[in-house]
């Protein structure tokens, strides 16, 4: 029961990590305008994501435009696009494999195969979490570096957007989910020792009493000889 509960907790965390990664990948708020120095008073605020950038006017109107070309984007944005898409794909595969390997499902009745599939799903969650964490940390480092650099104009400085916070939390969820699934399955030797020893016994000895167990007493009826009544 403990391993079943751990598998459920791990799967829920992995599913939340996948959904959070998808939302963070699509949000256009990886970088937001920084209101420091000469850019404190401005009528337009900008935010940039992996696929589009948005401009929010003082009137409350927001306009978003998808990038016209992907090849002209900075290297960190292109790498983040590839890694986030790969992370989402691997995490989706991890969800499918983990469902088959969980003990509460009816797929693949062989318990040993289910345990292996659960571990494989956990490994996929770990890989997906790492692929989602790397681009988020990379962009986070770039934002902080430019923000504190005196060589970058104030109008070109950005702050950390909500999507980066969501990406960090989602990747951590995926990593924790993978670790839980990998360690939720018991050791094969401890679980199947009795089963293997029972299968190894010959048929003639399965009905014999175990060592240290007293033999069953014969019934009173069997103790009488039938020849005494003839």
Curated annotation (Swiss-Prot):
GO annotation, cellular component aspect: bicellular tight junction; plasma membrane; tight junction
UniProt GO BP: bicellular tight junction assembly; calcium-independent cell-cell adhesion via plasma membrane cell-adhesion molecules; cell-cell adhesion; innate immune response in mucosa; paracellular transport; regulation of bile acid secretion; regulation of intestinal D-glucose absorption; regulation of intestinal lipid absorption
Major localisation: other
Region (Interaction with TJP1, TJP2 and TJP3): 229-230
Positions with biased composition (Polar residues): 220-230
Keyword Transmembrane helix: yes
Cross-link Glycyl lysine isopeptide (Lys-Gly) (interchain with G-Cter in SUMO): where in chain: 218
Sequence intervals crossing the membrane: 8-28, 82-102, 117-137, 163-183
Topological relation to the membrane, as annotated: Multi-pass membrane protein
Stated name of the protein: Claudin-2
Organism of provenance: Canis lupus familiaris
Phylogenetic classification of the source organism: Eukaryota, Metazoa, Chordata, Craniata, Vertebrata
């Amino acid at each position: 029961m403990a391993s079943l509960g751990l598998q459920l907790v791990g799967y829920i965390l992995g599913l939340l990590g996948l959904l959070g990664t998808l939302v963070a990948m699509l949000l256009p708020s990886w970088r937001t305008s920084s209101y420091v120095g000469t850019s404190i008073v401005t009528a337009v605020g900008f935010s940039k994501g992996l696929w589009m950038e948005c401009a929010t006017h003082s009137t409350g109107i927001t306009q978003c435009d998808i990038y016209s070309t992907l090849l002209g984007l900075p290297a960190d944005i292109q790498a983040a696009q590839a890694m986030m898409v790969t992370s989402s794909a691997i995490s989706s595969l991890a969800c499918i494999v983990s469902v088959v390997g969980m003990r509460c499902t009816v797929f693949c009745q062989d318990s040993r195969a289910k345990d292996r599939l659960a571990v494989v799903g956990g490994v996929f969650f770990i890989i997906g979490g790492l692929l989602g964490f790397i681009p988020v940390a990379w962009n986070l480092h770039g934002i902080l570096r430019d923000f504190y650099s005196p060589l970058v104009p104030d109008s070109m400085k950005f702050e950390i957007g909500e999507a980066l916070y969501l990406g960090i939390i989602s990747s951590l969820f995926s990593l924790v989910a993978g670790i839980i699934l990998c360690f939720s399955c018991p050791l094969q030797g401890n679980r199947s020792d009795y089963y293997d020893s029972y299968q190894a016994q010959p048929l003639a000895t399965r009905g014999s009493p175990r060592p240290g167990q007293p033999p069953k007493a014969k019934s009173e009826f069997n103790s009488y000889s039938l020849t005494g009544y003839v």
